[in-house]
Every structure is written in structure tokens, then in C-alpha cells.
UniProtKB/Swiss-Prot annotation:
SUPFAM superfamilies xrefs: Nucleotide-diphospho-sugar transferases
Disulphide bond pairs: none
Single GO MF descriptor: transferase activity
Family: Belongs to the glycosyltransferase 2 family.
Function: Involved in the biosynthesis of the arabinogalactan (AG) region of the mycolylarabinogalactan-peptidoglycan (mAGP) complex, an essential component of the mycobacterial cell wall. Catalyzes the transfer of the first two galactofuranosyl (Galf) units from UDP-galactofuranose (UDP-Galf) onto the rhamnosyl-GlcNAc-diphospho-decaprenol (Rha-GlcNAc-PP-C50) acceptor, yielding galactofuranosyl-galactofuranosyl-rhamnosyl-GlcNAc-diphospho-decaprenol (Galf-Galf-Rha-GlcNAc-PP-C50). Thus, GlfT1 is the initiator of galactan synthesis, while GlfT2 continues with the subsequent polymerization events.
Localization (cell): Cell membrane; Secreted, Cell wall
Complexes and interactors: Interacts with Rv3789. Is thus probably part of an AG biosynthetic complex.
UniProt miscellaneous comment: Was identified as a high-confidence drug target.
Biological process, per Gene Ontology: capsule polysaccharide biosynthetic process; cell wall macromolecule biosynthetic process; cell wall organization
Species in which this protein is naturally found: Mycobacterium tuberculosis (strain ATCC 25618 / H37Rv)
Pathway, per record: Cell wall biogenesis; cell wall polysaccharide biosynthesis
Highest taxon of the lineage: Bacteria
Protein name: Galactofuranosyltransferase GlfT1
């Protein structure tokens, strides 16, 4: 009997981008058996509801009257998929899409061949698919091109590392073992925290090098320091900085990631004091990290 695949897409006020994403999703050679769309702006007559209803496969529209963020949106969609009996859960957001119609079939074949609990495609720049949407560190070297992920001819899998949640494919049993994203994180860092759980579970996972998911470039946030040997993430938007730094304070306090703390202080200390000459920025980074470490998950502008 063929195992069922439920696609989960989270959206927030991007109906045009969502339509493009769903066009590619519903053109897969291996169609998902069911599509769940979580609308984080699901008040009243949302245009997303009509868009979802018009898809050529079975669908469920989950409109949320509260913006749950990416973390809460994916958690809601994943739990709904599990409750409906999904064997696999395939994730996507509204500002990206699979590179071609073979991505889901390729991921399933890769998971079967290598007995993977989770498999992700490469996440490439939607404007230049030869480049990665986010830089990937391998050892002390940062990779920025998709071709750099292959270290030998014919390599199909990059084991033990995966980008979540853009195009990520999970077995239902994997989600039962590691859980779903943490609602408290809202946005930013929820994928790192899930990746941490995947590693600690001991379950096999990785990146399929024969499949790609296209996403707007996020590399500009990663500022090179020490002649490019390291990077520090600095979003231009203050709200994104709040969630990035606060959540990273929490994530790096968790088992499995505490070993990165010394490097974190070196990178951001250098970035704020040497590169930017911004001691106030460093103190704000410290304040936000402290909020996360103490599990104070309020919104920007609050004391917690």
C-alpha cells in the first residue's frame, strides 16, 4: 500500500506568492495526497481560503485568528497531518517553492534508498539557483554555491545536516519521536531547535543533493568577519533581530548546542566591537540572548 504524503504550507499575507508555491506543489509527478494550508491571517473572508479550495487535490484550510508565526503555524499543520493519518509530512512556506515537478518523488526515493527519517532538498536562491539561499558551514568553511555541497562525483546525500523547513520531508514516526516546532519561538531559530532534536534523536537524516527548493536569498543577513572565516547574523529589520537573537539565546542553552557558546561570543563580540564599532549593539545582543536563555518569550517592546 502506498504511504500517504500530506503537504503543509504556512502563509501570512502573501496570497500571490502562495499561489505560485501551490502551482508547483500541485504539479509534482508524485502528488501529495492532501494539502494543509495554515493561514496566519485567517480572519473573516480570507482570499487564501478560496485559493486553497480551488486546488486540484484534497485540501484543508486552517485559518488562525492569531498569528502563530512560522513555528506555531508549522506545529499546527504538522499535528493536523498526523491526526489525519499521514505517513509523511512535506513542509513549505509561502515565499518559496520546489524547483521542479520531480522534487517530492526524488525526496521519497532518497529517503527510501538511505532509510532516512527526514530528508531535505538543497535550499537555493530563487533568483540564482546555482547559489544557496543561506550559507552553509561545513567545518570551518562556509559554502555559498549548491555545487560546493558535493564533495565527490555521484554523491546523492549530505548526511547529518538539513535545512528546515523549506521543502523538508518528515516521516510521521520521526515527528512522534522529536516533536513539532516550539510555538514560543514564533519565528527565527525554530528550525535550528528542530535540527538539534533530530541530531540528538540519533535518527538518520540529511540533504538530498538531487533536489532543490527555491527561496528568496537570506545570505545578506550573514556578515563576514575575520576575512570571511566566520560570519555573524545581523538582520536589518529590528523585529527580526529581536527574534533572531532572543531565540538563539534559548537554543544555544539547550543540550547539544552549548558547545557553540564560546564561538558565539567571539563572533558577535568581534562583529559589534570591531566590525561595526557598536558597543550599544553588543549590549542589546546580550540583553536579547539573556531573555532567551531565561525563557522569557514576550514580544518586542515587552519586558519579557
Amino acid at each position: 500500500m502506498t504511504e500517504s504524503v500530506f503537504a503543509v504550507v504556512v502563509t501570512h499575507r502573501r496570497p500571490d506568492e502562495l499561489a505560485k508555491s501551490l502551482d508547483v506543489l500541485t504539479a509534482q509527478t508524485r502528488l501529495p495526497d492532501h494539502l494543509i494550508v495554515v493561514d496566519n491571517d485567517g480572519c473573516g473572508d480570507s482570499p487564501v481560503r478560496e485559493l486553497v479550495a480551488g486546488q486540484p487535490i484534497a485540501t484543508t484550510y486552517l485559518g488562525s485568528r492569531r498569528n502563530l508565526g512560522g513555528a506555531g503555524g508549522f506545529a499546527l499543520g504538522m499535528l493536523h497531518a498526523l491526526a489525519q493519518g499521514a505517513d509523511w509530512v512535506w513542509l513549505a512556506d509561502d515565499d518559496g517553492h520546489a524547483q521542479d515537478a520531480r522534487v517530492l518523488a526524488t525526496l521519497l526515493a532518497c529517503a527510501e534508498k538511505y532509510s532516512l527519517a527526514e530528508v531535505s532538498p538543497m535550499v537555493c536562491n530563487i533568483d540564482d539557483p546555482t547559489r544557496l539561499a543561506f550559507p552553509l558551514r561545513r567545518g570551518l568553511v562556509w559554502r555559498r554555491r549548491a555545487s560546493e555541497l558535493r564533495t565527490e562525483a555521484g554523491q546523492e546525500l549530505l548526511p547529518g545536516i538539513a535545512s528546515l523547513f523549506n521543502g523538508a520531508l518528515f516521516r510521521a514516526s520521526t515527528l512522534a519521536a522529536i516533536g513539532v516546532p516550539d510555538l514560543r519561538l514564533f519565528i527565527r531559530g525554530d528550525e535550528v531547535e528542530m535540527h538539534r532534536r533530530l541530531i540528538r534523536s540519533g535518527l538518520p537524516f540529511g540533504t538530498c543533493l538531487d533536489a532543490a527548493y527555491l527561496h528568496p536569498c537570506g545570505s545578506d543577513e550573514f556578515k563576514p568577519i575575520l576575512c570571511g572565516r566566520m560570519h555573524a547574523q545581523y538582520p536589518d529589520d529590528p523585529g527580526k533581530r529581536f527574534f533572531t537573537y532572543r531565540n538563539r539565546g534559548y537554543v544555544l542553552s539547550q543540550p547539544g548546542l552549548r558547545k557553540l557558546l564560546a564561538q558565539e561570543w567571539l563572533r558577535f563580540g568581534w562583529f559589534f566591537l570591531v566590525t561595526r564599532r557598536d558597543p550599544k549593539g553588543l549590549w542589546e545582543w546580550i540583553r536579547l540572548r539573556r531573555l532567551g536563555r531565561r525563557e522569557k518569550f514576550g514580544k518586542p517592546g515587552g519586558s519579557a
